[in-house]
């Protein structure tokens, strides 16, 4: 029998680290595009007794007994995911977005097959063919990028590379791209060369669910996403697909037993909650505000003389180039962190600096919008960021901005005390 003892009583050192993180989340402004704040209900599910249950297999086809209730939970998550995204198939077991992506590769490809994906340096993801990832080591990865003049995806290059290399699979999706992706254009290119079309919509899944960004699910052969970011659920993954019995069978076996063992039932329950939350009118209004806030911030930076890659944004994020300011992304990240504004350094297209230094920062609005920030607050925030960068990290400017950040964070708490 376990003693009824708290973390602070049992492990004060760990409790202090957790408390410090709690304080950081409340007292700092979060602008990392892939981060958000999930609801108390989502966190409650993740801390439930479901964490104790092993459930290898799928609902009704488990390798362990005692799964009658987790079967209900997983089927609920599956049904809600299909309804939310208009999918014919859903697998809610992937532990994360990268695991979902690796399962797709395992299901549809053989080692050495050619994959055409977006370059990491131009806004793609590690799992889209980067050399340091399994996707670039196991498969023959060919990379496309952005048009140098527009800062948007170079679809002509995508088509040229597809015709030249005849990939088995084309990957559409991104981790740092601010415009609407033409999913149908990718579909047409894939069909020309007989390739699968795989869409990774991890960054925009919440926008898609709310109908403020085009839905790729019935266009692509397979679509994956994380369940955090704009979807505002637990840190986990999801695979979706349109009807295709052969692909569905391959995906099922690629996730289990191909890529994972037992599913995380506490996380799956949390996904079921976040899918239900995403069906609400409040969630739709939230996603609309996320985009409005990102566009408002981009406008301020442009007015202050900064270059925004592609000239603006249609979603929740944008890349701010600091080449003209002769500031590195690494320095800007550090200066803003000292002012309690969290961003991440990010390479910009054709960046002359290394990925560890970079010439830009990525800014996203999902978390600040969850806090309740509207256009007025984010415009003011963008001005503070520009002040810090323009000052080249002047200590007085940082201190002044930090005080303003603390005041606005107190006005807009993440969680009610």
UniProtKB/Swiss-Prot annotation:
What's the short name of a Pfam family annotated to this entry?
A: SHMT
Catalyses which reaction?
(6R)-5,10-methylene-5,6,7,8-tetrahydrofolate + glycine + H2O = (6S)-5,6,7,8-tetrahydrofolate + L-serine
N6-(pyridoxal phosphate)lysine PTM positions read 229
Ordered alphabetically, the record's keywords are:
Amino-acid biosynthesis, Cytoplasm, One-carbon metabolism, Pyridoxal phosphate, Transferase
Q: Which residue numbers mark the site Plays an important role in substrate specificity?
A: 228
Annotated binding of (6S)-5,6,7,8-tetrahydrofolate, by residue: 120, 124-126, 354-356
GO biological process assignments: glycine biosynthetic process from serine; tetrahydrofolate interconversion
GO molecular function per UniProt: glycine hydroxymethyltransferase activity; pyridoxal phosphate binding
Write down the required cofactor(s): pyridoxal 5'-phosphate
- Intracellular or extracellular location(s): Cytoplasm
Where does it sit, as one GO cellular component term? cytosol
Query: Where does this chain mainly localize?
Result: cytoplasm
Pathway listed for it is: One-carbon metabolism; tetrahydrofolate interconversion; Amino-acid biosynthesis; glycine biosynthesis; glycine from L-serine: step 1/1
In terms of InterPro entries, this protein maps to: PyrdxlP-dep_Trfase, PyrdxlP-dep_Trfase_major, PyrdxlP-dep_Trfase_small, Ser_HO-MeTrfase, Ser_HO-MeTrfase-like, Ser_HO-MeTrfase_PLP_BS, SHMT-like_dom
Which EC numbers characterise this protein's activity in its record?
2.1.2.1
Q: Which domain of life is it from?
A: Bacteria
Describe the task this protein carries out: Catalyzes the reversible interconversion of serine and glycine with tetrahydrofolate (THF) serving as the one-carbon carrier. This reaction serves as the major source of one-carbon groups required for the biosynthesis of purines, thymidylate, methionine, and other important biomolecules. Also exhibits THF-independent aldolase activity toward beta-hydroxyamino acids, producing glycine and aldehydes, via a retro-aldol mechanism.
Assembly and partners are described as: Homodimer.
Query: What is the name of this protein?
Result: Serine hydroxymethyltransferase
Q: Which species does this protein come from?
A: Acinetobacter baumannii (strain ATCC 17978 / DSM 105126 / CIP 53.77 / LMG 1025 / NCDC KC755 / 5377)
